[in-house]
């Protein structure tokens, strides 16, 4: 289990890094729904500067497994040309969702595109993506719930992160 105090500490650390790296700009945060909404809300409250937030929705999971296909359900609806963009994700496993997001953003001429994730599983990565801001690294075999992460829609409301029982 990863407790709420550990999570809070990591969120504050990531927010400080983002604030430092985006000094002098008004960044755009793209929150990937549904999972990242809890992380995004806490992260954004720790960044005391002007910013904009946009929500996108991509889907690649059924139950505990990736389908291997990323579906764009609700896309980018704002102009990010010349802007610093930070994609906020709850968990990065294969990297396919972030690869799709970067492809979507490629034609929008953002000044920079970086990724902030609460959790990554480096051993499961199948793509070459750079995760600039990462809270926790976990084992590939752990399936986790809580703090926005779910199992078939349940568990997002839990304040801590738990490894789901088999």
Tell me the role of every PLM-derived stretch.
Residues 1-166:
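PRPP-associated nucleotide enzymes
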